[in-house]
């Protein structure tokens, strides 16, 4: 789960991370009053959307008067902001964060993430802040600093000293950086986060370190322990189909292709998407129905796939282990009769009760195209939509 910048800063402040401060606006009629409450010489108006690249897209504006701030805020609120992360459709700006500006002497990058490949927690830092870490990695990879933390032993003093040293901090600034590392680590662990990113972390004119922008992503599986964080969820920032799928216990991610996929198991789902690409088409989604899906969940999965107007065909690829193929077949038939599937539907079944499942589909009277293996299924669905 993602949250907005102002929410991320609120959490980090609770853990002792110094951040820039401001006020959030959720209604246009509150803009003027909110800006009047800020007593500052420089105003920073920031669009609050769950995507990076806001600055380059015009979603962050720095102005030097209240009147300018009010005009910029009114112009920005409600626009469709298009960044390199939103896609061409953009994201509507329903919230603004208006901050007091500050002098910036130097910008840094600092984050903490789970490194699944190394089975550890990793700090990533750089003396080049204010730009995407991917851009730093591409242009100046030697400027990226990494420190790994063993979850069994936790954060140690040498981690904090090492990060401060590698970033070039000395004396009081080194002490500040050590405290920030400790605070961010504690926030990461205690909130079940998967990533905390501060970009940029700045040194201001007073020589103090300050988190000027912040992003936190949480592990959905840990949210039940954090109702206060769950309450920060902004459903307007999420794809409605993905939200609907999550509520039904389905793992769904919308993509840009035209072949809908329904699969059980994340690995099989990715293999299915790969082979669709191999045969010359593109998947419209990732959809894992899980190992314990029943008829109703299968029906809901197909309804979600067909809610995407770009879908021209559907490939169902099920390996029956825990899930029985006859249950899948009954769910497919129920969905087809209920919603009227009008696009080509290719079904590949294997595993538990596969012959019974195939028999149910064959006797259904519906126009379902059977496939005997994954390659056959991919070939048939691609040919069917041409």
From Swiss-Prot:
Any one Gene Ontology BP term: succinyl-CoA metabolic process
Pathway(s) this gene product operates in, as recorded in its UniProt entry: Carbohydrate metabolism; tricarboxylic acid cycle; succinate from succinyl-CoA (ligase route): step 1/1
Keywords: ATP-binding, Ligase, Magnesium, Metal-binding, Nucleotide-binding, Tricarboxylic acid cycle
Source taxon at top rank: Bacteria
UniProt keyword Metal-binding, yes or no: yes
Annotated Mg(2+) binding sites: 199, 213
GO cellular component: cytosol; succinate-CoA ligase complex
SUPFAM superfamilies: Glutathione synthetase ATP-binding domain-like, Succinyl-CoA synthetase domains
EC numbers: 6.2.1.5
Amino-acid positions noted as binding substrate in the UniProt annotation, renumbered to this chain: 264, 321-323
Domain ATP-grasp: 9-244
PROSITE patterns attached to this UniProt entry: ATP_GRASP, SUCCINYL_COA_LIG_3
Pfam families on file: ATP-grasp_2, Ligase_CoA
InterPro entries: ATP-grasp, ATP-grasp_succ-CoA_synth-type, ATP_grasp_subdomain_1, Succ-CoA_synthase_bsu_CS, SUCC_ACL_C, Succ_CoA_ligase-like_bsu, Succinyl-CoA_synth-like
Function: Succinyl-CoA synthetase functions in the citric acid cycle (TCA), coupling the hydrolysis of succinyl-CoA to the synthesis of either ATP or GTP and thus represents the only step of substrate-level phosphorylation in the TCA. The beta subunit provides nucleotide specificity of the enzyme and binds the substrate succinate, while the binding sites for coenzyme A and phosphate are found in the alpha subunit.
Protein name: Succinate--CoA ligase [ADP-forming] subunit beta
Organism: Rickettsia massiliae (strain Mtu5)
Organism ancestry: Bacteria, Pseudomonadati, Pseudomonadota, Alphaproteobacteria, Rickettsiales
């Amino acid at each position: 789960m993602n949250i907005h910048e102002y929410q991320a800063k609120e959490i980090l402040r609770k853990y002792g991370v110094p951040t820039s401060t401001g006020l959030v606006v959720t209604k246009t009629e509150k803009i003027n009053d909110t800006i009047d409450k800020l007593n500052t010489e420089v105003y920073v108006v920031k669009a609050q959307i769950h995507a990076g690249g806001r600055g380059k897209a015009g979603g962050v504006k720095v102005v030097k008067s209240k009147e300018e701030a009010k005009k910029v805020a009114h112009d920005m609120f409600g626009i469709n902001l298009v960044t390199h992360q939103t896609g061409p459709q953009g994201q509507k700006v329903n919230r603004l964060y208006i901050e007091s500006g500050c002098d910036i002497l130097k910008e840094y990058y600092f984050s903490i993430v789970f490194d699944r490949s190394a089975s550890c927690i990793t700090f990533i830092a750089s003396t080049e802040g204010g730009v995407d870490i991917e851009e730093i990695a591409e242009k100046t990879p030697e400027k990226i600093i990494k420190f790994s933390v063993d979850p069994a032993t936790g954060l140690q003093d040498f981690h904090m000293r090492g990060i401060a040293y590698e970033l070039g901090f000395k004396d009081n600034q080194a002490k500040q950086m050590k405290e920030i590392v400790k605070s961010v680590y504690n926030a990461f662990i205690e909130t079940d986060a998967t990533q905390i990113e501060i970009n940029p972390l700045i040194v201001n004119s007073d020589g103090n370190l300050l988190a000027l922008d912040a992003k936190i992503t949480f592990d959905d599986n840990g949210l039940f322990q954090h109702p206060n964080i769950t309450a920060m969820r902004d459903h307007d920032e999420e794809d409605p189909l993905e939200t609907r799928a999550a509520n039904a216990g389905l793992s769904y991610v919308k993509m840009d292709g035209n072949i809908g996929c329904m699969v059980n198991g994340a690995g099989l789902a990715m293999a299915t998407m790969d082979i669709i690409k191999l045969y010359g088409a593109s998947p419209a989604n990732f959809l894992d129905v899980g190992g314990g899906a029943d008829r109703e969940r299968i029906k809901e999965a197909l309804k979600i796939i067909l809610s995407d107007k770009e879908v021209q065909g559907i490939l169902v690829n099920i390996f029956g282990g825990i899930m029985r193929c006859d249950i899948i077949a009954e769910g497919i038939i129920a969905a087809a009769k209920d919603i009227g599937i009008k696009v080509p539907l290719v079904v590949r079944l294997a595993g538990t009760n596969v012959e019974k499942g195939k028999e149910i589909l064959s006797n259904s009277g519906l126009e379902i195209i059977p496939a005997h293996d994954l390659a056959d299924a991919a070939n048939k669905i691609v040919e069917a939509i041409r």
